[in-house]
From Swiss-Prot:
Induces paralysis 5 minutes after injection into blowflies (L.caesar). In most cases is not lethal 24 hours after injection, but paralysis is irreversible. May have antimicrobial properties, like most ant linear peptides. GO terms for cellular component: extracellular region. The modification Isoleucine amide is found at I81. InterPro entries: Pilosulin (IPR049518). Expressed by the venom gland. It comes from the Eukaryota. This is U10-myrmicitoxin-Mri1c.
Length: 82
């Protein structure tokens, strides 16, 4: 048997097992014996430190290079990004 036939055979066996599996049905009882209790307590402290990151540093470097190469384009981009 070649490898491609093995995967096809396993797929057919899997489908046949699903199709011919016995049907089961869940039975629900009318009395409720479940007890539920929930509580939620939360505290959060947010302290943020601004880190420029690599992307921001690369963008600033690219803008500096662009100012040297094409000053008009750099001015337009600088006005758009603020």
């Amino acid at each position: 048997m070649r490898l491609s036939y093995v995967s096809l055979t396993l797929a057919i066996i899997f489908v046949m097992a699903i199709v011919h599996a016995p049907e089961t049905e869940a039975k629900a009882y009318p009395e409720a014996d479940a007890v539920g209790e929930a509580s939620a307590v939360g505290e959060a402290d947010a302290v943020g430190v601004a880190d420029p990151g690599v992307g921001s540093l690369l963008a600033k470097a690219a803008l500096k290079i662009l100012k040297i190469v094409a000053p008009a384009a750099a001015e337009v981009i600088a006005n758009k990004i603020g």
